[in-house]
Amino acid sequence: MASTDNRDDLIARLNAETAKIRWHELQKHYAAGNLLGVSADEDLIKIAIAFHQDETTRVKNWLASGSLFEVSDNQAQQWFKDDAELWAVVIPPFVLVQEVSH
């Protein structure tokens, strides 16, 4: 039962630490190579939990499927042009971002 409580606590903490942020505030993380995108059809928190728990196989599978991706220069330029607002959560050393669905 403790592991369920710990997982629930982790979910609550990550939800509380997730926020909308403008692209211009994320550019330094992109420039440092620490920014990863999460596709709109994935759960940002689920992926953040996998990073937090060092679930390497799951992370590699998401990278292979494109559900998790390195933000391309073209995407970064588009977000800059649009002054995009993104969901973001920090899982050191990474910042995971996901486009805000409208």
Each language-model region and where it sits:
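N-terminal, charge-rich interaction modules
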Residues: 1-53
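Short, compact, well-ordered microdomains
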Residues: 69-102
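Short, hydrophobic/π-rich interface segment
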Residues: 46-78
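Generic secondary-structure microfeatures
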Residues: 40-42, 63-67, 93-95
